[in-house]
């Protein structure tokens, strides 16, 4: 038996305020399933619970959205301001996409990063089509695309919930990184958050030792925290885990650099559902 809540989320704290609320909630979950894994950023009760062990940690960054563009511009690191200005002067432009247009261009970048940089399969294209239909077309997010000349060289997919904007997906065209698209993209994300009345831009999870990405986020973020990965002590291996190595091997084969991109995409269509 598996209980999955908000799969692929960077973190998902239980909706409890203290240990007196956490204990009955967690006990019921443990009764239903012997395997329970959590990612907590705010809640301390699960972290202090002796029934769980900490199996990992990650960094979290956020940007408090200031009232004016000038205030926001002055707060970001000087190196970030220089990078944004340099990219703009070199001809990098950023456009906003609030419908299905441009989603395929972003997906092609995303597929290439997953495949050639990390050796991983990408989510199915229909996953991004669904995000577009359910978020972008309802003004609950935006796709930012960076262009140099006629080529799309970077993109960021942002999703909104209430007064928060989430930096959910980022992808870049590797040969285009010399034009520094990620800095104008980040600045455009901050501007979009301010213009749409958001109070926070959530930059999400970063692996603890991913120093390059940490430095990049710190140029813009004024908030930093820790995400704790927790797992029930002594939890037995679930039966579905037995297929894990096979799925992993298939993923590596289908995401190999010599495999046509169309085959890699189809591999994601077939296998990604098993990764939740």
Model-identified regions with their sequence ranges:
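A gly/proline- and charged-residue-enriched helix-loop-helix capping module
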Residues: 3-47
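Aromatic (often tryptophan-rich) hydrophobic motifs at membrane interfaces
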Residues: 1, 9, 17, 23-28, ...
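A short, structural micro-pattern
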Residues: 8, 32, 54-58, 88, ...
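Active-site/acyl-donor-binding loops of N-acyltransferases
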Residues: 43-71, 198-276
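A general structural signal for short secondary-structure junctions and capping/turn motifs
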Residues: 28-31, 52-54, 86, 219
């Amino acid at each position: 038996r598996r209980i999955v809540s908000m799969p692929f989320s960077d973190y998902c704290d239980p909706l409890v305020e203290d240990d007196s609320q956490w204990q009955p909630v967690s006990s019921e979950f443990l009764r239903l399933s012997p395997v329970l894994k959590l990612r907590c950023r705010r809640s301390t009760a699960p972290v202090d619970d002796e029934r769980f062990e900490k199996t990992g940690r990650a960094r979290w960054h956020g940007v408090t959205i200031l009232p004016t563009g000038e205030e926001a511009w002055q707060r970001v690191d000087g190196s970030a301001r220089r990078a944004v200005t340099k990219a703009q002067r070199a001809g990098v432009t950023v456009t906003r996409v609030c419908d299905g247009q441009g989603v395929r261009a972003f997906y092609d970048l995303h597929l290439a990063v997953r495949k050639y940089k990390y050796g991983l399969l990408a989510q199915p294209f229909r996953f991004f089509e669904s995000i577009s239909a359910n978020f972008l077309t309802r003004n609950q997010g935006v796709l930012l695309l960076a262009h140099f000349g006629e080529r799309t060289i970077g993109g960021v997919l942002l999703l909104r919930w209430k007064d928060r904007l989430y930096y959910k997906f980022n992808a870049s065209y590797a040969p285009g990184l010399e034009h520094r698209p990620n800095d104008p993209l980040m600045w455009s994300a901050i501007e979009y958050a301010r213009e749409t009345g958001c109070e926070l831009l959530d930059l999400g999870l970063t692996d603890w030792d991913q120093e390059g990405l940490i430095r990049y986020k710190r140029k813009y973020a004024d908030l930093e925290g820790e995400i704790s990965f927790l797992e029930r002590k002594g939890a037995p291996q679930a039966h579905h885990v037995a297929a894990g190595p096979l799925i992993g091997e298939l993923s590596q084969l289908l995401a190999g650099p010599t495999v046509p991109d169309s085959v890699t995409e189809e591999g994601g269509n077939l296998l990604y559902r098993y990764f939740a």
